[in-house]
Amino acid sequence: MDDRIINFEPLIEGVLIKRYKRFLSDIKLDNGEIVTAHCANTGPMKGLLNEGAKVRISYSSSPKRKLSWTWEQVEVTGINNEKVWVGINTLFANKLIKTVIEKNLLKDKLGDIATIQSEVVYGQDKKSRIDFLLTPKISNPDNRKIFIEVKNTTWKKNKIALFPDTETKRGQKHLIELKGVMPESKSVLVPCITRKDVDFFGPGDEADPIYGDLFRDSIDAGMLLIPCCFEFHKDHITWKGFKPLKLDG
């Protein structure tokens, strides 16, 4: 079975000089040229901002863009000095998970899906947008609509992928609203784990204990958790399957 899930043009390699002003990163390419790349991940990126780390960036010739380069991946040193590439472009997570849905990799967990809608307005104040709203096929035994929230997950401790890596009021609100659509609809949280060197997923209690409490409340109320793991390469991404939940360490 071919576990490649997405192919793309080979990325350009270089080393990280620095990330600054949240959105910007200076990269020294292998040919010696220094470029400024957009950094879509504005969080602390724990363990991923080591100066001199190998990185991969993409190029766009679109005249509408302020920056032609985008920082996509960074190499980190894992257990036993294993080199691991981590996907850091948070805007890519939804594309990955949509591909997983379209390839029916979630069929055993969600059943047959008829339609996929993106960025649908929902919530008590109608000011939030759910990443994906799925409508099941008539043949699906559970005919409830499925609300899916995707969380790009890069932080790792002790073989556990953790989200969030900082306090997130927005993430807290998402959990409250996911809980609110139940039981009339099904709510699903999908951590998009963009590194292969993990065995479990857990809430980032150390970074945001309130999120951790809300996460547990939502799970107890029936929210489905589907942590999806991926391995990043220079010109493709491979599917590494699901990771089980691990709480408290």
Curated annotation (Swiss-Prot):
InterPro entries: SfsA, SfsA_C, SfsA_N. GO terms for molecular function: DNA binding. CDD domains: SfsA-like_bacterial. It comes from the Bacteria. NCBIfam families: sfsA. Belongs to the SfsA family. This is Sugar fermentation stimulation protein homolog. The lineage of its organism: Bacteria, Bacillati, Cyanobacteriota, Cyanophyceae, Synechococcales. The gene is sfsA.
